[in-house]
A protein has these predicted regions:
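Acidic-histidine catalytic/liganding microenvironments
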Residues: 4, 17, 215, 262-263
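Glycine-centered loop/turn positions within well-structured domains
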Residues: 8, 81, 168, 188-190, ...
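Conserved AMP-binding/adenylation subdomain of ANL enzymes
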Residues: 8-25, 32-112, 121, 146
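Short hydrophobic/charged patches on amphipathic alpha-helices used for structural packing
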Residues: 62, 111-114, 209, 256
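Gly/Ser/Thr-rich phosphate-binding loop
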Residues: 71-74, 83-168, 181, 266
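Conserved ATP-binding/catalytic segment of the ANL
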Residues: 176-244, 261
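C-terminal boundary motif of the adenylate-forming
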Residues: 223, 262-279
Length: 280
């Protein structure tokens, strides 16, 4: 459950952090009931006054993106990978890499690619919901687009962490948003306190109690570590880590992340031998 306060305070926080203006544009394409859409697409739009465009359908998404020409665009690694795959269908990776190394052609090629994607007006590009490969961040940087990775969950309105321009460190999800505090428990769990933290789970006081520590910090269930300037690195889920037959602990996410770099792989699940796993 969220209140008006847990919606509005994060809205003001991200507006201040990103310097969002009333001439900014954004494309809404998630279900309107999604917590991120409620925060960014609804409350933050009303608070900041920027333009919000709506995608007509999945089939028209690319045209909708070109119609909106967003200045703010946040998506998931899977979509950023699809954009890259679409570019590679028209221009092989080796050829693109050669063209980007030619000073006279570099700017022209970058502009052409971003315009075709509908991303040529972007001044803030973000990625979240899953780890994004460092190689993909570097690829977009080569096009002049700095992808800022973020981190959050429904329980804190997705208002948790965001990389800062010029301070992106591959493998890290950035620093806390304004007024968000972070700590690592003795068990290695990331715990958070901030204005977006939920009131609790609807009609489920037992689960609500489990979600918070005795002193009021939100338990994320994620393992992590913090560097010297406060950037958070997620090292896996507390419950997903498994042990091999040789006694070695394995965290699946980094392995899955590497597999997804392959152009022919869309989804990847890593599990231990003999473990139950769902496959589609």
């Amino acid at each position: 459950m969220h209140s008006f306060a847990t919606l509005s305070r994060p809205a003001r926080g991200i507006i201040a952090l990103l310097g969002i203006r009333d001439d900014d544009r954004m494309l809404s394409y998630l279900p309107l009931a999604h917590v991120f859409e409620r925060w960014i697409g609804e409350v933050t739009t009303l608070t900041g006054g920027y333009q919000l465009f709506f995608a007509e359908s999945l089939e028209t998404f690319q045209q909708d993106l070109q119609r909106a020409r967003p200045t703010l665009f946040i998506s998931v690694p899977r979509l950023w990978l699809k954009f890259q795959a679409g570019v590679y269908k028209k221009m092989p990776p080796a050829k693109l890499a050669r063209l980007l190394k030619i000073p006279l052609l570099n700017r022209i090629v970058r502009k052409k690619i971003l315009t075709a994607l509908g991303l040529d007006q972007i001044r803030f590009a973000g990625s979240g919901s899953a780890p994004i490969p460092a190689e993909l961040i570097a690829w977009y940087r080569g096009l002049g687009l700095e992808l800022l990775e973020g981190y959050g969950m429904t329980e804190n309105l997705c208002y948790s962490h965001l990389s800062r321009p010029g301070q992106v460190r591959p493998g890290y999800v950035g620093q806390p948003y304004p007024d968000v505090q972070q700590r690592i428990s003795p068990e290695g769990e990331v715990q958070l306190r901030g204005p977006g933290n939920m009131l609790g789970y609807y009609k489920n006081p037992e689960l609500t109690q489990e979600a918070f520590t005795e002193d009021g910090w939100l338990r994320t269930g994620d393992r992590g570590e913090i560097d010297e300037i406060g950037r958070l690195k997620l090292t896996g889920r507390l419950k997903e880590q498994f042990k091999t037959s040789k006694g070695k602990y394995v965290v699946p996410a980094p392995i899955e992340n590497k597999l997804l770099l392959h152009q022919e792989i869309e989804q990847a699940v890593v599990s231990g031998s003999g473990m139950e796993a769902a496959y589609a």
